[in-house]
Amino acid sequence: MRMKLLGIVLTAPVALSSFASTGAISFTPGNISTDISLGTLSGKTKERVYNPDEGGRKVSQLDWKFSNAAIIKGAINWDLMPWLSLGANGWSTIDSRGSNMVDKDWLDPHNVGTWTDESKHPNTRLNYANEFDLNIKGWILNEPEYQLGVMAGYQESRYGFNATGGTYIYSENGSFRNEMGSFPDGERGIGYKQRFKMPYIGFIGSYRYDSFEFGGSFKYSGWVEASDNDEHYARAITFRSKVKNQNYYSIAANAGYYVTPHAKVFVEGSWNRITNKKGDTAVYDKNTGASDYSKNIAGIENYNFMTTVGLKYTF
């Protein structure tokens, strides 16, 4: 699938060049549009640990879940030519948001389907989340009523969490789930950060009927570079992982109404996912100064859903 999509995008310039050679090429420096919107972000990000000595099975997973974090989103697009557009957009959380984290371990190799240790941290905060996207679009069809094109771009996104307090159930001294308790309220447990960097390719289109306009896009990357930083404050240990060549999928749809010839109000929804893949981890012990590096023991995953309402203006 990766090579097929890449082939389609790479052959698009041939069609665009043919279109340009017909004499339709012209600069349109005045055709610039901007939009701003407000909305919410919900989703889940996951970190995993695998044991290569036990066939690479999963031995730990932390799920960081967030819901309805307020975001602000903006974009600017320049129709450089009738068949070529440049764009930049991004979004950011407006403030931190309450979230939830669950940490589970499967440490019994003889009963791999049953967790042995679990801690729950309902007092978790999504400290921040943000993203920027730079892209270029080539229009195969570009008419007042409809557009269809291919695009390529570069995108980065970041997430930061902090878990405090919570409860736990541990299996200690060879027993099973025999120790239960709670962490002091406000005590820092784990701090976690994720970062995703990726080039991508995709398709984009829109259709207008009278004052109504509908649009959508699909983006794909098989070249995601993910990294994370996991701080275990009580143990004074830091885990830093890197994963390469993960898959990314994004689907977005919008609907709008032109209140004036240049201004449109719109609603938009997007679903985004970065699939799990194994990577490498470096461990740093701040108590002793020791460090270690292991291959194929980490897993990083993220998915989210975003809804926004906004205003677009074309100059």
Report residues per predicted region.
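Extracellular/periplasm-exposed beta-strand and loop segments of Gram-negative cell-envelope proteins
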Residues: 43-69, 92-132, 157-196, 221-252, ...
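Residues on the lipid-exposed face of transmembrane beta-strands in outer-membrane beta-barrel proteins
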Residues: 74-78, 132-138, 152-154, 201-207, ...
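Gram-negative bacterial Sec-dependent N-terminal signal peptides
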Residues: 1-20
